[in-house]
Curated annotation (Swiss-Prot):
Belongs to the CRISPR-associated endoribonuclease Cas13a family. RNase activity on target is decreased by EDTA. Target RNA acts as an activator for non-specific ssRNA degradation. Changing residue 1283 to A: No longer protects against infection by MS2 phage, loss of ssRNase activity. Residues 900-1170 are annotated as: Linker. The gene is cas13a. CrRNA binds at residues 219, 441, 489, 759, 865. Residues 1-347 are annotated as: NTD. Residues 348-498 are annotated as: Helical-1. The active site is at residues 438, 441, 597, 602, 1278, 1283. Keywords: Antiviral defense, Coiled coil, Endonuclease, Hydrolase, Magnesium, Nuclease, Repeat, RNA-binding. This is CRISPR-associated endoribonuclease Cas13a.
Length: 1389
């Protein structure tokens, strides 16, 4: 239940000797009895106390007005802000006379820089300064003699100057003699310190002591405290004092250190961030400081030190009996037992009876009449008048709750009420509690009025009787449904109702969230399989449900679709060489998939009856291993040889890092590489030695290589082995642990603990907690790279232009003996242990990285949530597959130098030869390519004429294969004696080695062609060329050839010269034309010439990095400051040219803004012509469908809970189960007994099902024949979303916005899902636009609301300057078009 004491962390307990001690504790509920546990943080001891004792202490804490006592205990005029000294014997400074005289504090000598030997002798600075004053030391003196003790010999101490470094064995110190002017300035500043401290202390003390005002008895005491502070004249005097200090600093910057010292924010002692921020503001003389800043400091500082709290108002009672009764009432009202604990205590509880009564009345539509009748008794009009009267008096705090309670006392205390049934009493209570919430709304609105966020409180609108009736009806329905679903959840998940507790529900909640995404993963894979297979003899695109009722129906490989996943399907033995579907697919794969899906939906926890064999698992493992791209292939694809030609030493250094899998545990708590990447790129971009490259393509080549190397380096540094021989080495993980722990000693669990604390903090509403943790890790990592791998980011020696790069790439590729520069990657062993890992691995092979990453992250989140390693193996498999997919897409670069026409022809030939994607064995390669291999062997041994004569005729008889992979050289068995003699000069081992090498070369060539076949396709290439040609040729005369330099430079016309990967990788998408249609016109209209004119080249080479650096530095400078402070700073930047020039190192804001706008225009055009938005749109479609599919899975799960809950209450009867069906509710199929055959649950009879259907309808769930979820395939919202039609065929007949509305409407039965559909979908866009979260909380529909999308989304603002992101307005309009586009068609989906 958390810490009831708010900021209070200390609690009084008894030690073993029964002495009262104070310990730092956390309070939590203990479920094995009616007790709370105090977790003592220091040593994890526990002490149990009973409820009443704990609650009594809590109530005393809330009632006890000890604020003044706490304030005076922790603060006095000597420490409230500046750390000042008091006279001897004065512990607390409360008056001006208590301060030590300024002359005794600010001395004309300063001492610092003590040597280590002097520290060891224990001679203090004070002793040295006192002796120096006594001896009259001047700046000309070089030594001073001091006795440690009276009877000891004098020690001679050298007086160094500040430019001389101390040594290990010297006995020295720096003594600085302060000049008179500086000394007087410091004394005057010290007097100001005293004035500020005394004024602050007296203001706060006065407010706390004020009995009349009683600030801390107000609900919003912070606001009242702020008002009181700002009204006090002394706060203006304090501000004036601060300005005096600033003026003195401005005239002499050496004074800054003196002020900092007395502000005392350094050191190891506890300091608030609030104080540190105020100190920064005080010392930053270029920024305005206001009285509001001072008031905010006081409020937050008192809160930080646990001084302020709201004091409970307690009516004074003279009668002892009444006082005891009142205290008992308090105790009862504060005992907040866990709701699951309540459920156990009252399991035979009357709530079941109440809920059954509500269900019957909801079903009969009589509940609304009952609510309206009770509401009429509550006399709302009278209450409104009483409340308005009280508000006119200025009372808008807990007093209005008193009016409310008094108004309804007659209803709840009367004998008439006590005679009502439990069901009626509960209905009264629900209404009462709802109205109490409306009173709370009045209080919230009053605060908004006071803060000028609202004009006035509209009580009549808040307490409108007709609106109240509708809202209370929803509340009653929700109350009823919650209990039904609560019971159903326990029953469905087979949880023991007598022992259930919060830990059970925490585990269950984690599992539920994983299950929802797994069901969505099944749906996504079903879509991918529908791209490969189609129904036999049916000429439409009707969906096949491979993991449901369709899995054994007739379907065939779709010959119309050329899909790279066919190779995977064939290697899994799901189709044979004639492309017929095998039993392995129907009887095994889909059966296992169906079983696993049903296990999830039916919450089956018993051990799996495994259907798959180790041979099945090995097929998947072999596919993953065969798809792996070697380090050499990666090097070739990413041109590491060219980019890191002069950096072999740094690559060797990276390869020499020894890794340990023991560090794997820390990986999951660290930021992903994508989070670190922007800062890594900044290391490259901000390196002053690096000059701009000649073309965008050159920079892309360098950056792609740099990103890959850094990705591998990041993994290696995390996994670096902490061996004994590495003790002297600066290992990153050790550095990070020291940084997080802020000490030299290493806490081995610090990373895990830091991460989990950030997660806990985020769950409590601190949205920045995780980002703050990630930032700290990233800063440490970037610092580590700067110290140890700076050379990696220095490309000052890289002088090649794009032509030279391509020539070198060709030369290296043509050189067969060239030893490539590679980054050695660890070769993980893939293991599949059961059917679940088998099915998920295949799903991952069939899906894109965008989908795999979602389910991978959910497995990871569940692992952390439940603190389990159960899913670690599947996470490793998914990571491996994503890595393969990423690297495979990079293999396009080697084809840059091919003529497009030639390349298309080449692909046609490859398609003929490698239509089945079959990987051949060594024996098959030798037999199939015998002539090629033989010719290579003859060339190798050409000097031996006699031997070559035999090899040409008899090589196939000399090479003897034992099996498909092993062979031997036999020069005797199958050839004549004379031939044996001729072969005598050819070494047997050499011949075997050469044959094996040429088989491997041929194998590599075959794999390369197959890989090329998988990635490229002649049809795709032709379409690619067509789209590029359309852009170049379809131009008006004034725009003619504006795309020439981007796509086909004149001197290399018709070549795949500048490869647009974004276009190519999307062109094979069945929906390419639809997606491209959204942006094609914008690309045509783009001013592409701007990218290559003088202005554009200057922007690319200079302005982009300059603007990015300015924005980053500004963000770093203002990081951690309050919003108000940032606004003041930015306002001054925009209005004051001198201030802007001084802080930003640019002319003025207007010139900066002009440069920013030009850079933005350049980036926008660049993104268009590079086809970047194709990926974004495709990603949007996947993400939207994924989010909506999760909502549909949520609905399906809830239906299971509702059926089980109604059965648990005895409202409906069931007669058994259909184990092969997943859905919870029946579907009409024309048969009389559909309610027993079409759902997982068999309803007892038709009457029982009709009752269930009517109850569901009462809650807002329509299961009728023509309802949303029971419509035909192309109309049912359930099928449309679950079958991923938004991705498969977007915009057809429906807009996406309409489908979002339909899903939201379907889930409207539960107020828990209020607007959750909209909120989850719009989260997809949050990286690209700013979302109005207040608008998202309101009720709305997307269809029929013309301006709702404009209100929900605003262009993204970047940096603290609040500049509009370069493409945010364009993306916002693109999103609106994406959501609202509709293509009316008569075709079926």
């Amino acid at each position: 239940m958390g810490n009831l004491f708010g900021h209070k962390r200390w609690y009084e307990v008894r030690d073993k000797k029964d002495f009262k001690i104070k310990r730092k504790v956390k309070v939590k509920r203990n479920y094995d009895g009616n007790k709370y546990i105090l977790n003592i943080n220091e040593n994890n001891n526990k002490e149990k106390i009973d409820n009443n004792k704990f609650i009594r202490k809590y109530i005393n804490y809330k009632k006890n007005d000890n604020i003044l006592k706490e304030f005076t205990r922790k603060f006095h005029a000597g420490n409230i802000l500046f750390k000042l000294k008091g006279k001897e014997g004065i512990i607390r400074i409360e008056n001006n006379d208590d301060f030590l005289e300024t002359e005794e504090v600010v001395l004309y000598i300063e001492a610092y820089g003590k040597s280590e030997k002097l520290k060891a002798l224990g001679i203090t600075k004070k002793k040295i300064i006192d002796e120096a004053i006594r001896q009259g030391i001047t700046k000309d003196d070089k030594k001073i003699e001091i006795k440690r003790q009276e009877n000891e010999e004098e020690i001679e101490i050298d007086i160094r100057d500040e430019y001389t470094n101390k040594t290990l064995n010297d006995c020295s110190i720096i003594l600085r003699i302060i000049e008179n002017d500086e000394l007087e300035t410091k004394k005057s500043i010290y007097e100001i310190f005293k004035n500020i401290n005394m004024s602050l202390y007296k203001i706060i003390e006065k407010i706390i002591e004020n009995e009349t005002e009683k600030v801390f008895e107000n609900r919003y005491y912070e606001e009242h405290l702020r008002e009181k502070l700002l009204k006090d004249d002394k706060i203006d005097v304090i501000l004036t004092n601060f300005m005096e200090i600033r003026e003195k600093i401005k005239s002499n910057l050496e004074i800054l250190g003196f002020v900092k010292f007395y502000l005392n924010v350094g050191g190891d002692k506890k300091k608030s961030k609030n104080k540190k921020m105020l100190v920064e503001k005080i010392l930053n003389i270029n920024v305005d400081l206001t009285v509001e800043d001072i008031a905010d400091f006081v409020i937050k500082e008192l809160e930080f030190w646990n001084i302020t709290k709201r004091i409970e108002k307690v009516k004074k009672v003279n009668n002892e009996f009444l006082e005891k009764r009142r205290n008992r009432t308090y105790i009862k009202s504060y005992v907040l037992l866990d709701k699951h604990e309540k459920f156990k205590i009252e399991r035979e509880n009357k709530k079941d009876k109440i809920v059954k009564f509500f269900v019957e009345n909801i079903k009969n539509n009589s509940i609304k009449e009952k609510i309206e009748k009770i509401l009429a008794e509550f006399k709302i009009d009278e209450l409104i008048k009483k409340l308005e009267k009280e508000l006119k008096k200025g009372n808008c705090d807990t007093e209005i709750f008193g009016i409310f309670k008094k108004h309804y006392k007659v209803n709840f205390d009367s004998k008439k009420f006590s005679k009502k049934s439990d069901e009626e009493k509960e209905l009264y209570k629900i209404i009462y509690r709802y109205l109490k919430g409306r009173i709370e709304k009045i209080l919230v609105n009053e605060q908004k009025v006071r803060l000028k966020k609202m004009e006035k409180i509209e009580i009549e609108k808040i307490l409108n009787e007709s609106i109240l009736s509708e809202k209370i009806l929803k509340r009653v329905k929700q109350y009823t449904l919650e209990h039904i679903m609560y019971l159903g959840k326990l029953r469905h998940n087979d949880i023991d109702m007598t022992t259930v507790n919060t830990d059970d529900f925490s585990r269950l909640h984690a599992k539920e969230e994983l299950d929802l995404e797994l069901i969505t993963f099944f749906a996504s894979t079903n879509m991918e399989l529908n791209k490969i297979f189609s129904r036999e003899n049916i000429n439409n695109d009707e969906n096949i449900d491979f993991f449901g009722g369709d899995r054994e129906k007739n379907y065939v490989l779709d010959k119309k679709i050329l899909n790279s996943k066919i190779k995977i399907i064939r290697d899994l033995d799901f189709i044979d060489n004639k492309n017929n579907i095998t039993n392995n697919f129907i009887r095994k794969f889909t059966k296992i998939g169906t079983n696993e899906r049903n296990r999830i939906l039916h919450a089956i926890s018993k051990e799996r009856d495994l259907q798959g064999t180790q041979d099945d698992y090995n097929k998947v493992i072999n596919i993953i291993q065969n798809l792996k791209i070697s380090d050499e292939e990666v090097s070739k694809a990413l041109n590491l040889d060219v980019v890191f030609k002069d950096k072999k030493n740094i690559i060797t250094k990276i390869n020499d890092i020894k890794i340990s899998e023991e560090n794997n545990n820390d990986i999951k708590y660290l930021p992903s590489f994508s989070k670190v990447l922007p800062e890594i790129l900044n290391l490259y971009r901000n390196n002053p030695k690096n000059e701009p490259f000649d073309t965008i393509e050159t920079e892309k080549i360098v950056l792609n290589a740099l990103i890959y190397v850094n990705k591998e380096l990041y993994k290696k540094l995390i996994l670096e082995d902490d061996l004994e021989e590495n003790e002297s080495k600066n290992i990153f993980l050790q550095e990070l642990k020291k940084t997080l722990g802020n000490i030299d000693e290493i806490d081995e669990n610090i990373i895990e603990n830091y991460y989990k604390n950030a997660q806990i903090s985020a769950s409590k509403g601190n949205n920045k907690a995780i980002k703050k943790y990630q930032k700290k890790v990233i800063e440490c990592y970037i610092g580590y790279l700067r110290k140890n791998y700076e050379e990696l980011f220095d490309f000052s020696d890289f002088k090649m232009n794009i032509q030279e790069i391509k020539k070198q790439i060709k030369d290296i590729n043509d050189n067969k003996t060239y030893e490539r520069i590679t980054v050695k990657t660890s070769d993980k062993t893939i293991v599949i242990n059961d059917d679940f890992e088998y099915i998920i691995s295949i799903f991952a092979l069939l899906n894109s990285n965008a989908v795999i990453n979602k389910i991978r992250n959910r497995f990871f989140a569940t692992s952390v949530w439940l603190n389990t390693s159960e899913y670690q193996n599947i996470i490793d498999i998914l990571d491996e597959i994503m890595q393969l997919n990423t690297l495979r897409n990079e293999c396009i670069t080697e084809n840059w130098n091919l003529n497009l026409e030639e390349f298309i022809q080449k692909m046609k030939e490859i398609e003929k030869d490698f239509d089945d994607f079959k990987i051949q064995t060594k024996k098959e390669i030798f037999n199939n390519y015998y002539e090629d291999i033989k010719n290579n062997i003859l060339t190798e041994f050409k000097d031996d004429i006699n031997g070559c004569d035999v090899l040409e005729k008899k090589l196939e008889k000399i090479v003897i294969f034992d099996d498909e992979t092993k062979f031997e050289i036999d020069k005797k068995s199958n050839i004549l004696q004379d031939e044996q003699r001729k072969l005598s000069n050819i070494n047997k081992k050499d011949l075997k080695k050469k044959v094996d090498q040429y088989i491997k070369d041929k194998d590599q060539e075959i794999k390369s062609k197959i890989l090329c076949r998988i990635i490229f396709n002649s049809d795709f290439l032709k379409k690619y060329k067509k789209e590029i040609d359309n852009l170049i040729e379809d131009m008006e005369s004034e725009n003619e050839n504006k795309f020439q330099e981007i796509y086909y430079p004149k001197e290399r016309k018709n070549e795949l010269y500048i490869y647009k990967k974004n276009l190519f990788l999307n062109i094979g998408n069945p929906n390419f034309d639809k997606i491209y249609g959204l942006i094609s016109n914008d690309i045509k209209m783009a001013d592409a010439k701007f990218l290559f004119n003088i202005d554009g080249k200057n922007i690319r080479k200079n302005k982009i990095s300059e603007i990015d650096a300015i924005l980053k530095n500004l963000n770093d400078k203002l990081n951690g400051y309050s919003k108000e402070y940032k606004e003041k700073y930015i306002k001054k930047l925009k209005e004051n040219d001198d201030f802007f020039a001084k802080n930003i190192q640019n002319k003025n804001y207007k010139s900066f803004e002009k440069d920013y706008n030009r850079v933005s225009e350049y980036k926008k055009i660049r993104d268009l012509v590079e086809f970047n938005y194709l990926n974004k749109i495709e990603s949007y479609l996947i993400d939207i469908n994924w989010k909506l599919a999760i909502q549909m899975a949520r609905f399906e799960r809830d239906m299971h809970y509702i059926v089980n809950g109604l059965r648990e209450l005895g409202i409906i009867k069931l007669s058994g189960y259909n184990t092969g069906i997943s859905r919870a509710y029946p579907k009409r199929n024309g048969s009389d007994g559909f309610y027993t055959t079409t759902a997982y649950y068999k309803f007892f009879d038709e009457e029982s099902y009709k009752k269930f259907e009517k109850i569901c309808y009462g809650f807002g769930i329509d299961l009728s024949e023509n309802s949303e979820i029971n419509k035909p395939e192309n109309e049912s919202i359930r099928n449309y979303i679950s079958h991923f039609y938004i991705v498969r065929n977007p915009f057809a007949d429906y807009s996406i916005a309409e489908q979002i509305d339909r899903v939201s409407n379907l889930l409207s039965y539960s107020t828990r899902y209020n607007n959750s559909t909209y909120a989850s979908v719009f989260e997809v866009f949050k990286k690209d636009v700013n979302l109005d979260y207040d608008e998202l909380k309101k009720k709305f529909k997307l269809i029929g609301n013309n301006d709702i999308l404009e209100r929900l989304m605003k262009p993204k603002k970047v940096s603290v300057l609040e500049l509009e992101s370069y493409n945010s307005d364009y993306i916002k309009n693109l999103i609106i078009e994406l959501l609202t586009k509709i293509e009316n068609t008569n075709d079926t989906l």
